Amino acid sequence: MIALGGASGACLRFFISESMLKLLGRGFPFGTLAVNILGSLLMGILYGLLDKDIIAESPAKALIGVGFLGALTTFSTFSMDSLLLLQQGHFIKMALNIILNVMVCIFMAWLGLQLVMQKG
């Protein structure tokens, strides 16, 4: 279950990252930010569905939470992107990357949870 979810999440991450690179260029790690934002929103939704017993915990948590979302999102790439921006002297971009990845992703996880919890 985890491997199946992981393979799907990794493929989507690659597609999104490559698409963002082609669309917006290399000046800022938009691909990493995009997958982390999407993954955070989906994790909030998953947590809400699990909390309300709408989906079964073990299979969904393994397939979606650990596998798919674990492979889709990436803390290591976020860390490396931030380090490279620092080494290149792009201090404002580095700070923006850190702030956006942390604050926006936390907000999106909260939003995903709220979307589920407010229904019924």
UniProtKB/Swiss-Prot annotation:
Domain of life per record: Bacteria
InterPro entries per record: FluC
Regulation: Na(+) is not transported, but it plays an essential structural role and its presence is essential for fluoride channel function.
Keywords from the named record: Cell inner membrane, Cell membrane, Ion channel, Ion transport, Membrane, Metal-binding, Sodium, Transmembrane, Transmembrane helix, Transport
Spans traversing the lipid bilayer: 30-50, 66-86, 96-116
GO terms of biological process kind: cellular detoxification of fluoride
Keyword Transmembrane helix: yes
Similarity comment text for this entry: Belongs to the fluoride channel Fluc/FEX (TC 1.A.43) family.
Name of the protein: Fluoride-specific ion channel FluC
Gene that encodes it: fluC
